[in-house]
């Protein structure tokens, strides 16, 4: 899988704000996602991040993200509609299943927020978990990739010591049919996946 790693990705204002968010308490064996969106027309849907910071994130990150998408999957760039800026807290004893991202994610990104040390996102050769490659945790390090059907298997987990808090930054589309056509996959098969296991696919659409 092709991917990009960038250190010091967020500006100081956004990094300090996101690192100091007061989140609800979760148990050590669960994960919680806070959803925030910025649309290409400027509309905002927010939960835990203020509109001002979301505007700052969009203004300071979008150009770089589009450049990365143009590098990794240039045929998808024209489908962009909105950005996800989701805060994901993973309990110290929780392990998210190995998965590939939903087709509506044109570019998938994660920025490590806190603590100072934890388990990084792990990339695999396949769903079986062969050839694991952990992207080492470093505060304000960003990992980006553009999903494909066969080469974007990954997961994440707590380190058994501290909860893991990240910003998941995705470039998104609602035109899943067009993405399926570009990737050469069966749109009806994707719809069948969602129908047969809607809970998992709704959740995978939210998280990294």
Predicted segments — roles?
Residues 109:
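Substrate-binding/active-site groove segments that recognize
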């Amino acid at each position: 899988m092709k991917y990009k790693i960038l250190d010091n990705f967020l500006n100081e204002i956004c990094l300090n704000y996101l690192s100091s968010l007061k989140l609800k308490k979760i148990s050590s064996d669960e994960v919680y996602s806070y959803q925030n969106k910025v649309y290409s027309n400027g509309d905002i849907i927010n939960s835990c991040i203020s509109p001002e910071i979301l505007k700052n994130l969009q203004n300071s990150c979008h150009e770089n993200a589009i450049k990365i998408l143009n590098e990794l999957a240039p045929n998808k760039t024209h489908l962009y509609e909105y950005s996800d800026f989701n805060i994901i807290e993973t309990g110290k004893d929780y392990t998210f299943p190995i998965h590939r991202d939903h087709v509506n994610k044109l570019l998938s990104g994660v920025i490590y927020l806190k603590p100072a040390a934890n388990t990084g996102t792990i990339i695999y050769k396949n769903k079986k978990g062969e050839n694991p490659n952990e992207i080492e945790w470093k505060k304000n390090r960003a990992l980006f990739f553009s999903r494909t059907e066969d080469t974007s298997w990954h997961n994440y987990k707590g380190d058994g010591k501290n909860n893991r808090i990240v910003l998941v930054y995705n470039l998104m589309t609602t035109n899943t049919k067009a993405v399926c056509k570009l990737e050469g996959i069966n749109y009806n098969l994707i719809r069948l996946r969602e129908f047969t296991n809607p809970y998992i696919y709704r959740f995978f659409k939210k998280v990294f």
